[in-house]
Each structure stands twice: as structure tokens, then as C-alpha cells.
Amino acid sequence: MQDNNINIRSAHLEGAEVAWFAPLCNGDDQYLGRHDIRYKSDWSNTSNVLLTADRLGFRNILCPSSYQVGQDTLTFASAVAPLTSNINILTAIRCGEVYPPMLGRAIATLDHLLKGRLTINIISSNLPGTNLSSEARY
């Protein structure tokens, strides 16, 4: 029998990383287009998801940003940071929502709270009511 597997090796790749997702934005669900109250965006549910991922050994969790009703990413991450011990918190931040000097200070403070376990995802998306070209956004 022929082996059809393709082995990929890299000196810089230790293995695949599987991260998790914190349901900060209302409407996030295990299925697209369905709203399930078990996955609502509140402190109890969302912090439980994050702390469970931390306890189970996940190395990273995404705290998304959205224009939907939900929790603020940086505020939530700051509140849950002292409760974690191992997991990196990947905070998504949309350009234009926060004044850059204030964002810098907030990120620096959060990085101290997490003792270097902060990851940032800067999203260059449109703001509500605008429709810039990709070239202008990037």
C-alpha cells in the first residue's frame, strides 16, 4: 500500500498550535446563524471559557473585537488576567476605535498584568459608516 502522507518539517516549527476562542461578542455560537443563550457574552460564561482553556493547557485564546453587542476586549482581558497562570491572551483591536497613546498605555499595563503573555491582533477594518478601499485601510 502506498503512503500518501506528506511530511512537512521546519527547524522553526515545534508543532501545530491549537488556540481557543472566548465568546466576547454577542451572537457567537457553536453554529453559524444560530443564537444559543449558553454562549452569551457575559462575565460568567466568557471567563469560564477562558479559565477552562487555561486549566486544560491551551497556550493561546482569542478575545475578539466586534461591532456587535458584547464585552470590551481590553477591559475583559484586564479583569481576567490575574486569574490566569499559563495561557496567552490574544486581544483583537480595531484601528480607529481607541486613541493610539491611550491604547499604548492600556496594552503596556495589560502586558504587565499578564507577565508577558499578551498577544495583540491589530485589525485594519472599516469603522461603522465608512467603506475605505483595502489600500487606504492598510
Feature names for model-found ranges:
Residues 2-84:
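N-terminal beta1-alpha1-beta2 module of alpha/beta enzyme domains
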Residues 7-39, 100-138:
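Flexible, glycine-rich active-site loops centered on histidine and acidic residues
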Residues 61, 89, 118-120:
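Hydrophobic residues within beta-strands of alpha/beta enzymes
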Residues 68, 95, 125-126:
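Positions that flank functional sites
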Residues 71, 88, 107-108:
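Active-site loop-helix segments enriched in His/Asp/Glu that coordinate
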Residues 84-90:
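Conserved catalytic cysteine-centered active-site region
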Residues 90-103:
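Aromatic/His-enriched, Gly/Pro-containing loop or helix-boundary segments
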